[in-house]
UniProtKB/Swiss-Prot annotation:
Encoding gene per record: ribH
GO cellular component: cytosol; riboflavin synthase complex
Protein name: 6,7-dimethyl-8-ribityllumazine synthase
InterPro entries: LS, LS/RS, LS/RS_sf
Organism of provenance: Prochlorococcus marinus (strain AS9601)
Molecular-function annotations in GO: 6,7-dimethyl-8-ribityllumazine synthase activity
Pathway(s): Cofactor biosynthesis; riboflavin biosynthesis; riboflavin from 2-hydroxy-3-oxobutyl phosphate and 5-amino-6-(D-ribitylamino)uracil: step 1/2
Keyword hit for Magnesium: no
Record: residues binding (2S)-2-hydroxy-3-oxobutyl phosphate: E90, T91, R132
Top-level EC class as recorded in UniProt: transferase
Residue positions binding 5-amino-6-(D-ribitylamino)uracil: F23, S61, F62, E63, A85, V86, I87, F118
Keywords assigned by UniProt, alphabetized: Riboflavin biosynthesis, Transferase
Alphabetized NCBIfam families for the sequence: lumazine-synth (TIGR00114)
Catalysed conversion reaction: (2S)-2-hydroxy-3-oxobutyl phosphate + 5-amino-6-(D-ribitylamino)uracil = 6,7-dimethyl-8-(1-D-ribityl)lumazine + phosphate + 2 H2O + H(+)
EC number: 2.5.1.78
Length: 158
């Protein structure tokens, strides 16, 4: 019986793309910071001159799938992390954005055989988003861990 798992010890060999929404940037900047901190602590070069990590900013979470798709056509990545924050408002816009962003990201991931980590916070309030972006816990760190594990797993399976 063969058992395959992702490895955190080979993280420094990964090529990571990050697509991030500018909308709600008070939140997304904090998530990005946590994400980059985790990647750096696991051996990736996150400096501005890095060839290991690329960051693409988009207007909002709805645009994350097309940016991820275009990014993957340009370079070869082991994993992509999609970061955003969608906070429920008084209209149905929230539901549309979350539905289309999640479907689009999943579709792009499957079409390209590259894992895309869904790091889009979906909260009812700004307070909930702030708690998940650093007041209590920074989920950016968790998204980076998922990226390391999935990137190394798919790399090993290929």
């Amino acid at each position: 019986m063969a058992i395959f798992e992702g490895s955190f010890t080979t993280a420094s060999t990964l090529k990571v793309g990050i697509v991030i929404a500018r909308f709600n940037d008070l939140i997304t900047n904090k998530i990005l910071s946590g994400c980059l901190d985790c990647l750096k602590r696991h051996g990736l070069d996150t400096s501005e001159l890095s060839n290991q990590v690329d960051i693409v900013w988009v207007p909002g979470s709805f645009e994350l799938p097309i940016a991820a798709k275009t990014l993957m056509k340009k370079k070869s990545y082991d994993v992509v992390i999609a970061l955003g924050a969608v906070i429920r408002g008084e209209t149905s816009h929230y539901d549309v954005v979350i539905s289309e962003a999640s479907k689009g990201i999943s579709q792009v991931s499957n079409e390209n055989n590259v894992p895309i980590i869904f790091g889009v916070l979906t909260t009812d309030t700004m307070q909930q988003a702030l708690e998940r972006a650093g007041i209590k816990n920074n989920l950016g760190w968790n998204y980076a861990l998922q990226a390391i594990e999935m990137g190394s797993l798919i790399k090993n399976l290929n």
